[in-house]
């Protein structure tokens, strides 16, 4: 499935070459941490594929911002909750790229607050479809484009290690991501492909909108050494570093980026 922006800009992007630049795909890049990551990678001169599910206007704005700064980007649409979503996104990425993908950031994810007593099966399955199945099979489908020096970054969460609130199902998906980081890093190391994870704490995004209130900030500060609310850029800069050559000797690690939460 392709978004309208991808269709309108793909031909123009094909006319450009980026032999010296890295190529990157960031899932869930229309807003939040994904948006900030796409912009950070573009500042490193990467050609960025901006994935979105339904937020076409927001994805278009990210692409426009990158292009206005002299960078290269296109938007790709895919519903990663669907069984064929990762395959569709990989197919669109292959069409947009020149046979090479250097950076994959599996950022797209959904969250849900529900107690063990109240979690519906359908919602549980959707959480695992988007947060675990999608990055697994997207990685599988894109591996033929990734060679030595490529980097994969999977998004985990502080919640995988630190029980907070009624997020057991969501936290379980992020625990699965932690496991995938280790296994992928071991399996792909012989190919020269690095795999790492980033585990944010509470970040000022739509997913954690409660921190935009005084009460929400106070709740966070009680658990956090650094007394401010994290912004998406705080996480994106770490992701961009892990994707860069500066992190060439780091693989299989999960970096906790949480301002010193629960030290």
Question: Over which residues does each language-model region extend?
Answer:
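Conserved glycine-rich cofactor-binding loop
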Residues: 30-31
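Short, small/polar-rich loop/turn modules that mediate ligand/substrate recognition or access, typified
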Residues: 105, 189, 194, 250-252
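Substrate-binding pocket helix/loop in short-chain dehydrogenase/reductase
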Residues: 115-116, 120-128, 220
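Active-site helix of classical SDR
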Residues: 139, 173, 181
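Alpha-helical segment proximal to the catalytic Tyr-Lys
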Residues: 144, 186-190, 248
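Residue(s) in the substrate-gating loop at a strand-loop-helix junction
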Residues: 157
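C-terminal helical subdomain
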Residues: 197, 219-250, 259
